[in-house]
């Protein structure tokens, strides 16, 4: 699904915006794909195990694994997403150069799609596919594609690459919501959402701590590393307390 939306974004950017905007988007997209690959790998590893549990009718154990997976993936997803948002102002010009400073906004927007894609990954890889609910999965992807197409058509002409990034976030949100609705009568989605609220709050506190530093930070590697260490420390301490 992510590949579909990013491909759509690139095609529409090429047709409706400039080469510079395309470059900003592609650079930002690579970072997001790299950062979120651990979430994709987690889902791929867990799918055979969940398929075996469902085929054996072991619902209690499958629910336990899903709860553990949701907690683990969402802890990682919020740390990555809000961590990227926190340091993007320094990261973009340091990593790519001053000409790519606008990537900070695009990178931040794309990062917000990670929690949605992470939660949807658990539902898809550990419930929909193991239970043969391919139709619900395909429908969610179609709805996401339509949402992305609509959002891009409205936003890219006005906002360029940032508009495409926002369209991707909207699409991932729609996919996540559609998959949750597909399984709401079978599993307690609300309980999973409540358990992830803590990680969202921890991520926001991490973001707040880094933003305090960022107000006086210079665009140097040392300041970037300091922000990463402070943000990571705040998040890890809160996670341990949880």
Language-model features: locations:
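A helix-boundary/kink motif common to multi-pass secondary transporters
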Residues: 17-18, 55, 96, 133, ...
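Specific pore-lining/lateral-gate transmembrane helices of multi-pass inner-membrane transport
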Residues: 24-142
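Transmembrane alpha-helical segments of multi-pass transport proteins
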Residues: 144-147, 194-242
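Short runs within selected transmembrane alpha-helices of multi-pass transporters and secretion channels
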Residues: 2, 6, 40-44, 105-132, ...
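Membrane-embedded alpha-helical segments of multi-pass transporters/permeases
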Residues: 11, 15, 38-41, 81-89, ...
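Helix-capping/transition residues at the boundaries of transmembrane alpha-helices
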Residues: 14, 51, 128-129, 156, ...
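Signature of the first transmembrane helix
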Residues: 1-19
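Alpha-helical transmembrane segments and their helix-entry boundary regions
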Residues: 10, 22, 136-138, 164-165, ...
């Amino acid at each position: 699904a992510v590949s579909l939306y990013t491909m759509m974004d690139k095609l529409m950017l090429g047709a409706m915006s400039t080469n510079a905007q395309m470059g900003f988007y592609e650079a930002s997209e690579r970072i997001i794909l790299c950062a979120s690959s651990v979430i994709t790998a987690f889902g791929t590893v867990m799918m055979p195990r969940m398929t075996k549990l469902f085929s054996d009718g072991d619902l209690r154990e499958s629910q336990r694994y899903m709860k553990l997976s949701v907690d683990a993936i969402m802890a990682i997803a919020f740390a990555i997403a809000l961590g990227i948002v926190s340091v993007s102002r320094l990261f973009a010009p340091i990593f790519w150069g001053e000409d790519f400073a606008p990537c900070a906004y695009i990178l931040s927007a794309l990062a917000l799609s990670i929690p949605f894609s992470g939660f949807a990954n658990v539902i898809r890889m550990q419930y929909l596919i193991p239970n043969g609910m391919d139709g619900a999965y395909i429908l969610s992807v179609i709805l996401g594609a339509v949402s992305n197409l609509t959002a891009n058509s409205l936003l890219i002409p006005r906002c360029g690459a940032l508009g495409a990034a926002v369209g991707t976030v909207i699409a991932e949100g729609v996919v996540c919501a559609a998959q949750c609705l597909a399984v709401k009568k079978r599993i307690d989605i609300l309980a999973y959402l409540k358990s992830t609220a803590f990680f969202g709050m921890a991520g926001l506190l991490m973001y707040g701590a880094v933003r305090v530093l960022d107000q006086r930070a210079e665009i140097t590697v040392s300041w970037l590393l300091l922000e990463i260490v402070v943000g990571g420390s705040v998040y890890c301490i809160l996670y341990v307390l949880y």
